[in-house]
From Swiss-Prot:
Comp. bias intervals (Basic and acidic residues): 276-304, 366-380
Lineage: Eukaryota, Metazoa, Chordata, Craniata, Vertebrata
Organism: Rattus norvegicus
An annotated GO BP: mRNA processing
The protein's name in its UniProt record: WW domain-binding protein 11
Renumbered residue ranges of the record's region Disordered: 1-37, 186-213, 236-549, 588-623
Biased composition, class Low complexity, residue ranges: 381-404
Motif (PGR): 455-466
Residues recorded as bearing Phosphoserine in the entry: S181, S237, S279, S283, S353, S361, S364, S600
MF annotations from Gene Ontology: protein phosphatase regulator activity; WW domain binding
Crosslink position(s): Glycyl lysine isopeptide (Lys-Gly) (interchain with G-Cter in SUMO2): K557, K572
Start and end residues of each stretch annotated as Interaction with PP1: 217-221, 306-310
Positions where N6-acetyllysine occurs in the chain: K13, K565
């Protein structure tokens, strides 16, 4: 990279003489700084001890090439440290090569010695690691010469040999005992015993029968086993074991019919018992126990392939019981809600589970009449519940028109949402159904019929009407709100019996308080027919032609005619609302200020009249100029001051 000229920029533009001088001065400064930096680096390198650097590198090598202990630092960290130390050592070598060659030669010797030590460490480490990986079995052994014949095998103690007895001494000169020799059966490499020596005896204890049989077949003579041994040996014979197993299988397959018949008899007995004892709850529990046992037996008979099924076995009772078992309390409750007839078995299941759930229910269920009457009651009750559910949906009837039946005890899930007051008039056409807040399948505990198990529901919220207890205030039909001033409103006349009462959203109370800000002390005598319009018609502005035209257009365009002028009942309060707070002055002389206040009130009502067309229909209003507004303001000030 060549040097750039100081008279031009990087792109070749001619530079200002001032910039040229600044650039040259900066170049000189950088050159001087570079010399200083080189001197600082040389001084730092001279301060470092090269022998210490070599020792640090040796420590790193010992840590890395240690076959016993894993290195504490990571392999990458060790490489980085050695690289930095080596670079520093080479810089010191270059420095001393220029300045002091004698020190340079000494440092070279140190480096060569370090490299030799490092190579030795690495070689030892590799040898140990390779020895750890090599398997011992793969190492070839040298060929061993044959054992000399003068070595006696008897002198070598065998692990299973019995030591010679101390008590009984056998004479070498006595008659030799005959022994069955089994030496030819052994390997050929074993040297023979010298004459006159006995081979070591067998291990203590009788030999196992398998060994005796094997050697009896090989040598050629039969061995007579004791009867106990022969019986034990039969256990090891595969043919006999197979034959015995077949006999056992045939006997078990013949005997399998007996438990099956017993189970069938027990199954039929349980069927008859359950048919006769249906009205008793305890017999229900026993019946379920029998049924579970019979179901378990049936599944075991299906699984085992050894059972024999005959053609004359009755199979319908099992199917019937299975169908009876499958009717759960939930299905029975849904059948009852739909108004259908519940099978006897399912209903008793439901009653049994419910008797366990309801601890504080009445004892009327214990004294049950005959089965037929109970069935008719439950059927009629289910149909009445379904009809009341169809006739009285909770949303279609306001709570003020429907009265819940009187509750003799605490209801299942909370207080009954029944307003205490009933509006006067003829009774409505709807029968009193369940309360609007409760789900349709919940009945008060006083009503007859089968109670289903209580579902896990959230407790209902507050009742739709007023809280119980008639506080002084509006009757239950009105929505809660600020108490209306004036005469108390009358209830709407109740609907004739044939027509359902209107929804709560459609009923409007006859007298609603006005929405606008009322004067502090009084109530306006007539309510506004359109509370959305907040001002009077623009006929307040004293311009006769424009006022007549605008009033005519109002009557043509708007559906509701605005005919009331602002009735100022408290002029002082109304005027001071439009005045800045700093100018609110109260005078004792009311007679002198009454007329200007009335006039200023009429002027101050103009901004409200201008704001009116935004909320209501579009009304053409004559625009006031700044002079008119200023003149009205000055008149207002004159009236106040």
């Amino acid at each position: 990279m060549g040097r750039r000229s100081t008279s031009s920029t990087k792109s070749g533009k001619f530079m200002n003489p001032t910039d040229q001088a600044r650039k040259e001065a900066r170049k000189r400064e950088l050159k001087k700084n570079k010399k200083q930096r080189m001197m600082v680096r040389a001084a730092v390198l001279k301060m470092k001890d090269p022998k210490q650097i070599i020792r640090d590198m040796e420590k790193l090598d010992e840590m890395e090439f240690n076959p016993v202990q894993q290195p504490q630092l990571n392999e990458k960290v060790l490489k980085d440290k050695r690289k930095k130390l080596r670079e520093t050592f080479e810089r010191i070598l270059r420095l001393y090569e220029k300045e002091n060659p004698d020190i340079y030669k000494e440092l070279r010797k140190l480096e060569v010695e370090y490299e030799q030590k490092r190579a030795q460490l690495s070689q030892y480490f590799d040898a140990v690691k390779n020895a750890q990986h090599v398997e011992v079995e793969s190492i070839p052994l040298p060929d061993m010469p044959h054992a000399p014949s003068n070595i006696l095998i008897q002198d070598i103690p065998l692990p299973g040999a019995q030591p010679p007895s101390i008590l009984k001494k056998t004479s070498a000169y006595g008659p030799p005992t005959r022994a069955v020799s089994i030496l030819p059966l052994l390997g050929h490499g074993v040297p023979r015993l010298p004459p006159g020596r006995k081979p070591p005896g067998p291990p203590p204890g009788p030999p196992p029968p398998q060994v005796l049989q094997m050697y009896g077949r090989k040598v050629g003579f039969a061995l007579d086993l004791p009867p106990r041994r022969r019986d034990e040996d039969m256990l090891y014979s595969p043919e006999l074991a197979q034959r015995g197993h077949d006999d056992d299988m045939s006997s078990t397959s013949e005997d399998d019919g007996y438990p099956e018949d017993m189970d069938q008899d027990k199954h039929d007995d349980s069927t008859e018992d359950s048919d006769t004892d249906r009205s008793d709850a305890e017999s229900d529990g026993d019946e379920f126990g029998h049924r579970d046992d019979s179901e378990r037996d049936n599944t075991e008979e299906k699984k085992s392939g050894l059972s024999v099924r005959f053609a004359d076995m009755p199979g319908k009772s099992r199917k019937k019981k299975k169908n009876m078992k499958e009717l759960t309390p939930l299905q029975a409750m849904m059948l009852r809600m739909a108004g259908q007839e519940i099978p006897e078995e399912g209903r008793e299941v439901e009653e049994f589970s419910e008797e366990e759930d309801d601890d504080d229910s009445e004892d009327s269920e214990a004294e049950k009449p005959s089965q037929k009457q109970h069935k008719e009651d439950s059927h009629a009750d289910g149909s009445s519940a379904a009809s009341s559910q169809q006739q009285a949906p909770p949303q279609a009837v306001p709570p003020s028109q429907i009265q819940a039946p009187p509750m003799p005890g605490p209801p299942p899930l909370g207080p009954p949402p029944a307003p205490p007051l009933r509006p006067p008039g003829p009774p409505t056409g709807l029968p009193p159904g369940p309360p609007p807040g409760a789900p349709p399948f919940l009945r008060p505990p006083g009503m007859p019929g089968i109670r289903g198990p209580l579902p896990r529901l959230l407790p209902p919220g507050p009742p739709p009407g007023r809280p119980p207890g008639p506080p002084p205030g509006p009757p239950p039909g009105l929505p809660p709100g600020p108490p209306p001033r004036g005469p108390p409103p009358r209830l709407p006349p109740p609907a004739p019996p044939g027509i359902p009462p209107p929804r709560p959203g459609m009923m409007r109370p006859p007298l609603v308080p006005p929405l606008g800000p009322a004067p502090p002390g009084l109530f306006p005598p007539a309510p506004l027919p359109n509370p959305g319009v907040l001002s009077a018609p623009p006929s307040l502005i004293q311009r006769p032609k424009a006022d007549d035209a605008s009033a005519a257009t109002i009557e043509k365009k708007a559906t509701a005619t605005i005919s009331a002028k602002p009735q100022i009942t408290n002029p002082k309060a109304e005027v001071t609302r439009f005045v800045p707070t700093a100018l609110r002055v109260r005078r004792e002389n009311k007679g002198a200020t009454a007329v200007p206040q009335r006039r200023s009130e009429e002027d101050s009502a103009v901004p409200v009249a201008k704001a009116a067309p935004r909320s209501g229909p579009s009304v053409p209003v004559s625009v006031q100029t700044k002079d008119d507004v200023y003149e009205a303001f000055m008149k207002e000030m004159e009236g106040l001051l």
